[in-house]
Amino acid sequence: KEKVIVVLKDNAYGHGARLIASEAKKFGIKNCAVKSEFEANEIADIFENILILSHISTGDESAKFTYAINDIDALLKIKENTKINLAIDTGMHRNGLDISELDYAFEILARRNLELLGAYTHFRASDELNADYFVQRENFNAAKAKILALCDEFGIKKPIFHSHNSAALERASAVEDEMVRVGIAQ
């Protein structure tokens, strides 16, 4: 239960965020992810550990939440000392930092005293029976190795890693990361 992040974005995919959050809490789930700060505030009384996935950095972020960083611009604009997770693009090409941007990202997060709690990816089309999932998983393993080396270099505490969404969990024979994100799978 400590390894699960329940994803409640878009009103828990239309099923009711407060209802699903309450039920998840009853089962011992302690972590959740939502789309926006608005959604996070709706369930802040239920969960202490909330990751906001699609936030546009304003410099006015709340200390209550953890924010996903999807690009260098977000690192430059987010409020100093904010808790963050780095999104890593491993093949989805929609959001996340490219592995080639990690050196610069760490320079910024160290300079701005950002608290790196995690790093993650989202496996594109993990429900499709092709090699994409395996390629993306290897890309994430390379990114993890780079992140751990940069943490050592900059004296930053090792973050937790999470990569598997619901569909990827159905394909995985084992999960190598500290956490998984469970939302909805068909």
Predicted regions and their residues:
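Active-site-proximal beta-alpha core segment in soluble small-molecule metabolic enzymes
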Residues: 2-162
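Active-site loop ensemble at the mouth of alpha/beta enzyme cores that anchors a bound cofactor
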Residues: 170-186
